Curated annotation (Swiss-Prot):
Origin species: Staphylococcus phage S25-3
Protein purpose: Assembles to form an icosahedral capsid.
Predominant subcellular localization, coarse grouping: virion
Subcellular location: Virion
Keywords, sorted A to Z: Capsid protein, Virion
Protein name as annotated: Major capsid protein
Length: 463
């Protein structure tokens, strides 16, 4: 309820005068543009805090990149030998008194590793370095380029694929990562369950049968946290600090397997590129979005064991060229009825005059988070005669899951070949700006594929 008060003429006169004085007072205000910074505000200095708050990952998050050893390379193609097997053992080595055993040679084979080229380019105007900045723009760009190249090397060390190209007999720009190099018999399917001691022991045993010793396990931090949560009910640790406060909980940084101690590493960035970021705007030279159709095919040796995973399967496809990626395709959905069904995706890619599409990335939506997770990358060279790319989803890779890589982290087993260690290269100036690139040439070498294991489809805390 509003109470109105009647003012006399004299009171009204003074009230109007007071209002006018308030309006005309010399105030600084909150304006931050010349149009709004008037009167006292025109005298106010603009203050920019000299601390830059980092809201993304840093080099400290690149655990695998920091741990792996490096070895110099002297050629774009490096060969190395693998001692696969000794000579025959057993009854054939027993002979009569004057006999000698038949000849039995060891099995040795050559392998090759092709060097790949990683680069990040930056450009800044000369004027941007002359003004009064809170930080040196050149240093900011250099540090960012180093971080981008290092992150690219780490990501490719896990998920790189040299087959992603449009050339039938060609080789893609990436080097092969652990997901491709690890022996197929050392791939353990968790089938959407959380990581357990059983999985780690199984990985250690398989690595041991390959005459290796599991020393390290790399996983997203969500997998690590879920692993810790799974054993909270069996163990409890109460700690009292100097102030008398009682704290609970603990961090599991290692696991004693049947083959020895395994250090557990939780990564904050390991799976970032496996989740579709639909907020990214395509570059001007990006390929056109793909056209996708989804049909259900029976008797495809599918693995849709959980009925809840069969209904409303949603897919999106992104087309990748060497320099850019398209916007996601329109969503296509399918529902399978049987365990062994498969979802056949027919993908049509438009050719470009400037950029040739090299591969397509196929994403499937998770039921819990609603985000789209990468389930397969298919090279354009695998296209059918009519130009369409066909992929059948047999539920081999589950959305909302991650990988755990377990293995022997020694220079004799796995390392990076480096043809060119990371360096900064100034580029030609054609205007009033400075352009430079940070380069790295090399590739991952897994000399003993059976001394590493991959635990796939591991449930984790996805954010």
């Amino acid at each position: 309820m509003t109470i109105e008060k009647n003012l006399s003429d004299v009171q009204q006169k003074y009230a109007d005068q007071f209002q006018e004085d308030v309006v005309k007072s010399f105030q600084t205000g909150y304006g931050i543009t010349p149009d709004t910074q008037i009167d006292a505000g025109a005298l106010r200095r603009e203050i920019l805090d000299d601390q830059i708050t980092m809201l993304t990952w840093t080099n400290e998050d690149l655990i695998f990149y920091r741990d792996i050893s490096r070895r110099p390379a002297q050629s774009t193609v490096v060969k190395y030998d693998q001692y696969l097997r000794h000579g025959n053992v057993g009854h054939s080595r027993f002979v009569k008194e004057i006999g000698v055993a038949p000849v039995s040679d060891p099995n040795i084979r050559q392998k090759t590793v092709s060097m790949k080229y990683v680069s990040d380019t930056k450009n800044m105007s000369i004027a941007s370095g002359l003004v009064n900045n809170i930080a040196d723009p050149s240093q900011i760009l250099t540090e960012d380029a180093i971080a981008v190249v290092a992150k690219t090397i780490e990501w490719a060390s896990f998920y790189g694929d040299a087959s992603l190209t449009s050339e039938v007999e060609g080789e893609g720009l990436e080097f092969d990562g652990l997901a491709k190099l690890i022996d197929k018999n050392n791939v353990i399917n968790a089938k959407g369950n959380q990581l357990t001691e059983k999985h780690l022991n199984e990985a250690a045993v398989r690595i041991g049968k390959g005459f290796g010793t599991a020393t390290d396990a790399y996983m997203p931090i969500g997998v690590h946290a879920d692993f810790v949560n799974s054993i909270l009910g069996r163990q409890m640790q109460l700690m009292q600090d100097n102030s008398g406060n009682v704290n609970t909980g603990y961090s599991v940084n290692g696991f004693y397997s049947s083959r020895g101690f395994i250090k557990l590493h939780g990564s904050t960035v390991m799976e970032n590129e496996l989740i579709l970021d639909e907020s990214l705007q395509p570059l001007p030279n990006a390929p056109q979005p793909a056209k996708v159709t989804a049909t259900v095919e029976t008797k495809q040796k599918g693995a849709f064991e959980n009925e809840e995973d069969r209904a409303g399967l949603s897919y999106k496809v992104v087309v990748n060229s060497d320099d850019a990626q398209s916007a996601p395709s329109e969503e296509v959905t399918a529902t399978v009825s049987n365990v062994d069904d498969g979802v056949k995706l027919s993908i049509s890619v438009n050719a470009m005059y400037q950029q040739q599409p090299q591969f397509v990335s196929i994403y499937r939506q998770g039921k819990e988070t609603g985000m789209y997770f990468l389930i397969k990358r298919v090279p354009v060279k695998d296209a059918q005669e009519d130009g369409t790319i066909v992929f059948v989803d047999k539920n081999e890779t589950l959305p909302e899951t991650a990988d755990v890589f377990v293995g022997e982290m020694s220079p004799q087993v796995v390392h990076l070949f480096e043809l060119l260690p990371m360096m900064k290269l100034p580029l030609a100036q054609i205007n009033a700006s400075i352009t430079f690139a940070v380069l790295w040439y090399g590739a991952l070498a897994l000399r003993a594929p059976k001394k590493w294991a991959r635990i796939k489809n591991v449930r984790y805390i996805a954010v």
